[in-house]
Design a protein with these regions (language model features):
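C-terminal accessory domains and tails appended to enzymatic cores
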Residues: 3-6, 10-120
Length: 120
């Protein structure tokens, strides 16, 4: 049975803001902006009717590139965030537990960061 070495998943509407930055996989979209526009254009329903999801998605990729390293020069000009879903190829892994673990780690990181700020 053939399986890919890695499986990544992206979240379109929220952009994985509930995943710790060090657990995000950075997908560099910089070299092919024309490809990103063409892929977005395939979904006409997302472009017509007054909502320009194509422009919003492009703007998010640009913002991700800038905000990915807040204290360093930009490495990318366009960036998508993904998460590693490879462990889910093992059918014994419960998807809800797998995702909840990401949320739990994010929650712990937020509490730790806030705690450090108040101890000063």
């Amino acid at each position: 049975e053939e399986r890919p070495e890695k499986v990544y998943g992206c979240e379109v509407w929220r952009d994985l803001d509930w995943v710790c930055d060090d657990e995000k996989v950075y997908l560099d979209c910089s070299p092919h902006p024309n490809l990103m526009r063409c892929l977005s254009a395939v979904f006409d329903s997302q472009i017509v009717g007054g909502k320009r999801y194509d422009l919003a998605a492009e703007g998010r990729r640009l913002a991700n590139a800038t905000f990915s390293a807040s204290h360093a020069c930009d490495t990318y000009s366009a960036l998508n965030y993904a998460m590693d879903l490879t462990p889910l190829m093992d059918q014994s892994v419960d998807i809800a537990d797998y995702i909840a673990a990401y949320i739990d780690r994010f929650k712990a990181q937020v509490k730790e960061t806030i705690g450090r700020s108040y101890r000063k």
